[in-house]
């Protein structure tokens, strides 16, 4: 994770709770933090997309996730989003792939830049 304090950006190992600091996660940190949550919810597959996947995240970037699992329904997705936001201290945009139209721009973004951050078969 990166901590930003003024103009200096440093790698920080662990979590920082002081609200005056903002941070940008690297993908490996995101994977480590979300793994136990996805294990608990028994999610099959998750893609990271958007600014974090493109390595263009800023201090105010949210984290965009796409769940590829037909058994995760709306109420469970809402609860999952809350747990992820709490663990990451970031806004999360979470999508269920089955609810996105195939010809939509977001669908194309997910599959052109998406990075697997969780797969129940390999975690």
Locate each region found by the language model.
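Catalytic core of pol beta-like nucleotidyltransferases
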Residues: 2-45, 53-59, 70-123
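Short beta-strand->loop micro-motif that forms the acidic, two-metal-ion catalytic signature
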Residues: 64-67
């Amino acid at each position: 994770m990166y901590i930003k304090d003024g103009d200096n950006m440093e790698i920080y190992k662990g979590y920082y709770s002081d609200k005056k600091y903002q941070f940008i996660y690297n993908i490996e940190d995101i994977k480590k933090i979300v793994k136990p949550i996805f294990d608990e919810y028994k999610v099959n597959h998750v893609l990271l997309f958007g600014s974090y996947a493109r390595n263009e995240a800023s201090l105010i970037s949210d984290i965009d996730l796409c769940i590829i699992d037909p058994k995760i329904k709306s109420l469970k997705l809402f609860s999952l989003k809350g747990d992820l936001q709490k663990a990451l201290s970031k806004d999360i945009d979470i999508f269920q792939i089955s609810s996105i139209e195939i010809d939509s721009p977001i669908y194309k973004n997910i599959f052109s830049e998406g990075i697997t951050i969780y797969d129940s078969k390999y975690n």
